[in-house]
Swiss-Prot record:
Alphabetized UniProt keyword annotations: RNA-binding, Transcription, Transcription antitermination, Transcription regulation
Stated role: Involved in transcription antitermination. Required for transcription of ribosomal RNA (rRNA) genes. Binds specifically to the boxA antiterminator sequence of the ribosomal RNA (rrn) operons.
Organism lineage: Bacteria, Pseudomonadati, Chlorobiota, Chlorobiia, Chlorobiales
Biological process according to GO: DNA-templated transcription termination; transcription antitermination
Gene for this chain: nusB
Pfam families cross-referenced by the UniProt entry: NusB
Name this protein carries in UniProt: Transcription antitermination protein NusB
Amino acid sequence: MKTYRRQIREKILQALYTIELRDTDIDSAAGWLLTQEILDDPNAMKFFNMLIGSIKAHMSEIDCYIERHTFNWDMSRIAIIDKNILRMALAEILYCEDIPPKVSINEAIEIAKKFSSTEKSSKFVNGILDAIFNELKTDGKIHKNGRGLIDHSTAKLHKNETSK
């Protein structure tokens, strides 16, 4: 299943949207949306559990980043889809160590193009995520390894130093 991460991102977005509209928890909402194909794939389930767990555990911290970078907007005025795309992408950037931040941002933009109601949403999502990413990078709060490294030359340098 080549696109399982995109499918899972879309399912989690739908779950986040559902909990904003109904009185339910994220696990129940996401569980209703999982396909058998995802349930049968251990890598897909690992990614699902990691991403949904990160969103649940760090929602208030993630929302603080969004609020800080949407200074002219009250969180309640941000479209539900856009807000939840931002939450999901930030959870990936901050807590999914093997996914490069630029991949998370690009995926968020593509999902915004597919699910948001206006053409401006993808630009809004891109601008907010880019600003938050730059802050996180400056503050040294992005911790990636393996395929998630931001700069592979750093990985080579570290590998060369440890092999001496």
